[in-house]
């Protein structure tokens, strides 16, 4: 999880984001009905954010794919001299630390942990790199200049940080419809190949016809997702000759509908629901995944009941509402609309979406703003450290230490230690150069002293020889000339040595005047670096020491394009809308799930009167319990027979994180209203995640503070008054005591303590990988009740953000997992209507569609 991680747009998006991303599926026993958390007292234990890097926070950028050449000269295994760092971060230094790791165009502190799909980045990058002269024509520049002359001068103000408001260029038409549906426009997916074997094995032209029908059908749906797209309407609007093969059009339409690519969410039905229901399904939990699955199954003609332990729906999508105050306690960010199914839902529901501005000034513990140069320098080093850990993992295969998987936190500390060692090595090398130069100078001076004595002696001899009055004989004349020659040679040699002396003294002076840094990071630099680490811990909802070094950002390549947005009227509007018309039993906590070859039985209790027990019989159970509830010991829900070892092992290996929020409702705005985010730099590494980021997202004067990393768990054991007091102390340090009033309302989330969540969202723990998400998604088939009996069919299914490998920890991931399981269950019990030639009869298990 860089997200996750990245184009020029991502660079702009950088400051924004990891804040409570999307929410996961329901809760143990169902979520509540009205996803709002109405005026609750401070201390409300409400849903946490679900989603790695929810939009809006400066989410740390995720590492790029591994490269062939080592970044920063990090060519030796851990323990060696380490990355070749150049100048290091020192107090007052304005030069970025040069670890040698290439800088990327990634955005800083963005809610997107992940980068946008590469194939749609080129246009955006080229536009972002244009100068103003290149971007505007000469006429436009002249017109602009004339217009500016007529305008009155603006009032003086601090120059704002540049914000890149451009959106990545996305394909349009049928190609764009495939893109928005997360499908390749020019080839069949492996799932389509399995469902349409006659097409994939046929001629190329047949596949092209299939792809056009598929893409055009998607386009028709996306053009108007408020109304059901029927087969008849599709056939009528398909252009000739693609509408000639009605059987193929019907199969494609059925396939897209069954798998939640069209006719999903909240839309007006053209065809009424079948009066006779086929098959009974119990869904545990009314979070987004459970609600999405229920609506689909209901539209397919199945009898569906949701069991929700809370008194509202929505699960970890929970909105606090009181008067004019609105604030999301759980998921609150839409991480880009390009390819996001929430883009469709946002057209169906009144979601008031607003872009999150990425500017995010940092304030130190003393309340002073971090200088921009220092901020950028440390952030650059943070990105380089991540690059170095990627190189350690993917190129040097440094993933196991002492027979234990290496965490991202461990690797970062290793790289930092290597950099510190490198600094010491540079110091040693520097002093060696000084000593060597001094030795050379000493040796030179000794030579010069000896030479001077020789010159003195020779000069005396020359003087004496010269005093012989002429006429001198040949011997005497030769002696004078030879002494003169020797004296000239020695003087020349002395001059050369004197010149060398000057150079050595200059070199020595330069060495002594320019010592290398004696530290890799000053204490101030480390505090700012810890802020970035806290932001990364926020994006993943867990301390870095628990994240898998190799796989923490395995979902990076599936990040959606576009700006991150917040739902200003509260994210709970989505689950409330999805819940309309469904049979939901609130305050009903599931205690036991029995599944056999012949059917299932779910035993639940009333949460307000646990003596009241309910038994529900059904053909299949869809479990959308959060991973935190599945991990709970002793188990909150008993499965009979117990879940197989492969499933429980995946549950144990995967991580379920924690992230909390403090909502502060004021009577007036005392912060910069143009800024959506500002950060608070902690004074210690241990407290780096404590109230490290403040959000200003809503119309009312509300600030939302985040608590991440180790601090998220510690804070759950502290009273609301202490937490709110700490928030106010930080704000007064930044804005001044007189500027900060007492809040009118406060709410503190405690997601780990929430019995129906037990945390915020999943992460890839050390020892886990993306494969575990696939294992979590696999249904369970009970063993045959009688030896030799026909092989039973799956009865127990799983959905939720922890079951979708490519989009974990997000609301859209939860939604997609619900659509996936609804298709799987319907294929199993109603038959796959898009297959040829055999059609399964209702009620009779049909050939199973491939895993989605």
Curated annotation (Swiss-Prot):
Compositionally biased region (Low complexity): 7-25
Residues bearing Phosphotyrosine? 135
EC nos: 1.14.99.66
Q: Which PROSITE patterns match?
A: SWIRM (PS50934)
Please name the GO terms that the record assigns under molecular function.
chromatin binding; DNA-binding transcription factor binding; enzyme binding; FAD-dependent H3K4me/H3K4me3 demethylase activity; flavin adenine dinucleotide binding; histone demethylase activity; histone H3K4 demethylase activity; histone H3K9 demethylase activity
Give the sites modified to Phosphothreonine.
Answer: 59, 104
Q: How is its activity regulated?
A: The N-terminal sequences of INSM1 and SNAI1 compete with histone H3 for the same binding site and thereby inhibit histone demethylation (in vitro).
Glycyl lysine isopeptide (Lys-Gly) (interchain with G-Cter in ubiquitin) cross-link located where? Answer: 503
Q: Which domain of life is it from?
A: Eukaryota
Query: Can you list the GO cellular component terms from the UniProt entry?
Result: chromatin; chromosome, telomeric region; DNA repair complex; histone methyltransferase complex; nucleoplasm; nucleus; protein-containing complex; transcription regulator complex
In this chain, the stretch annotated as Disordered covers 1-176
Q: Name one GO biological process term.
A: neuron maturation
Q: SUPFAM superfamilies, alphabetically? A: FAD-linked reductases, C-terminal domain, FAD/NAD(P)-binding domain, Homeodomain-like
Q: What is this protein's expression induced by?
A: Down-regulated during neural differentiation in neuroblastoma cancer.
Species, as recorded: Homo sapiens
Q: Which residues form a coiled coil?
A: 110-151, 428-514
According to UniProt, the name of this protein is Lysine-specific histone demethylase 1A
Q: Where are the transmembrane segments?
A: none
Q: Which cofactor does it need?
A: FAD
């Amino acid at each position: 999880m860089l997200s996750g991680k990245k184009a020029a747009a991502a660079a702009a998006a950088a400051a924004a984001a990891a804040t409570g991303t999307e929410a996961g599926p329901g809760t143990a026993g169902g979520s509540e009905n009205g996803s709002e958390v109405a005026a609750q007292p401070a201390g409300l234990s409400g849903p946490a954010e679900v989603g790695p890097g929810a939009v809006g926070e400066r989410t740390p950028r995720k590492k790029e794919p591994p490269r062939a050449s080592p970044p920063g000269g990090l060519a030796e295994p851990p323990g060696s001299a380490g990355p070749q760092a150049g100048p290091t971060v020192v107090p007052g230094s304005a030069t970025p630390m040069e670890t040698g790791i290439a800088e990327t165009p990634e955005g800083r502190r963005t809610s997107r942990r992940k980068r946008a799909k590469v194939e749609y980045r080129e246009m955006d990058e080229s536009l972002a790199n244009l100068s103003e002269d290149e971007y505007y024509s000469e006429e436009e520049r002249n017109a602009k200049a004339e217009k500016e002359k007529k305008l009155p001068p603006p009032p003086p103000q601090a120059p704002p940080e540049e914000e890149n408001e451009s959106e990545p260029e996305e394909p349009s038409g049928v190609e764009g419809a495939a893109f928005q549906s997360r499908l390749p426009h020019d080839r069949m997916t492996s799932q389509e190949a399995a469902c349409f074997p006659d097409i994939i094995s046929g001629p190329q032209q047949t596949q092209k016809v299939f792809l056009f029908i598929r893409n055009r059908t998607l386009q028709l749906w996306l053009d108007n997702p408020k109304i059901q797209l029927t087969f008849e309407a599709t056939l009528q609007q398909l252009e000739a000759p693609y509408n000639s093969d009605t059987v193929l059009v019907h199969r494609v339409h059925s396939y897209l509908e069954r798998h939640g690519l069209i006719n999903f969410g909240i839309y007006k039905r053209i065809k009424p629901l079948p009066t006779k229901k086929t098959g009974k399904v119990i869904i545990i939990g009314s979070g987004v995944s459970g609600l999405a699955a229920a609506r689909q199954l209901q539209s397919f003609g199945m009898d569906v009941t949701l069991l929700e332990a809370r008194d509202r729906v929505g699960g970890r999508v929970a909105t606090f509402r009181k008067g004019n105050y609105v604030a999301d306690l759980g998921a609150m960010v839409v991480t880009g609309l390009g390819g996001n199914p929430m883009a469709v839902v946002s057209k169906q529901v009144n979601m008031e979406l607003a872009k999150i501005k990425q500017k995010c000034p940092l304030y130190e513990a003393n309340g002073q703003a971090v200088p921009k140069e220092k901020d950028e320098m440390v952030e650059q080093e943070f990105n380089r450290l991540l690059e170095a850990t990627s190189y350690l993992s993917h190129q040097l295969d440094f993933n196991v230490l002492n027979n234990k998987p290496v965490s991202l936190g461990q690797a970062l500390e290793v790289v930092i230690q290597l950099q510190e060692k490198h600094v010491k090595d540079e110091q040693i090398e520097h002093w060696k150069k000084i000593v060597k130069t001094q030795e050379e100078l000493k040796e030179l001076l000794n030579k010069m002293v000896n030479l001077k004595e020789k010159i003195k002696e020779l000069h005396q001899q020359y003087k004496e020889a010269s005093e012989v009055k002429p006429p001198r004989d040949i011997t005497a004349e030769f002696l004078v000339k030879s002494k003169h020659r020797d004296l000239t040679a020695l003087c020349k040699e002395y001059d050369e040595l004197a010149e060398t002396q000057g150079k050595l003294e200059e070199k020595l002076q330069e060495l002594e005047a320019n010592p290398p840094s004696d530290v890799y990071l000053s204490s101030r630099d480390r505090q700012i670096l810890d802020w970035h680490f806290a932001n990364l811990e926020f994006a993943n909802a867990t301390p870095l020491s628990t994240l898998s070094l190799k796989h923490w950002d395995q979902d990076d390549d599936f990040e959606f394009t576009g700006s991150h947005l917040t739902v200003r009227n509260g994210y709970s509007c989505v689950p409330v809308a999805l819940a309309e018309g469904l049979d939901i039993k609130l305050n009903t906590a599931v205690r036991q799930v029995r599944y056999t070859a012949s059917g299932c039985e779910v035993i639940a209790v009333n949460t307000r009167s646990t003596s009241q027990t309910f038994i529900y019989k059904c053909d299949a159970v869809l479990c959308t319990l959060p991973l935190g509830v599945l991990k709970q010991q002793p188990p909150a829900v008993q499965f009979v027979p117990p879940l197989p070892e492969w499933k429980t092992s995946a549950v144990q290996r995967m991580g379920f994180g924690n992230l909390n929020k403090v909502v502060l409702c004021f009577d007036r705005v005392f912060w910069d209203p143009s800024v959506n985010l500002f950060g608070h730099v902690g004074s210690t590494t241990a407290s780096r995640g404590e109230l490290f980021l403040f959000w200003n997202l809503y119309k009312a004067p509300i600030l939302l503070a985040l608590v991440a990393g180790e601090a998220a768990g510690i804070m759950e054991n502290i009273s609301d008054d202490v937490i709110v007091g700490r928030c106010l102390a930080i704000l007064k340090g930044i804005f001044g005591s007189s500027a900060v009033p007492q809040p009118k309302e406060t709410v503190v989330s405690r997601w780990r303590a929430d019995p129906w969540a037990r945390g915020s969202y999943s992460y890839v723990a050390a020892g886990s990988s993306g494969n575990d998400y696939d294992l979590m998604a696999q249904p369970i088939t009970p063993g045959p009740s009688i030896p030799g009996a026909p092989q039973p069919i799956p009865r127990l299914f799983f959905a939720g953000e922890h079951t979708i490998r490519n989009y974990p920890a997000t609301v859209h991931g939860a939604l997609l997992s619900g659509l996936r399981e609804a298709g799987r269950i319907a294929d199993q019990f109603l038959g796959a209507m898009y297959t040829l030639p055999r059609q399964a009869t209702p009620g009779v298990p049909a050939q199973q569609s491939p895993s989605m």
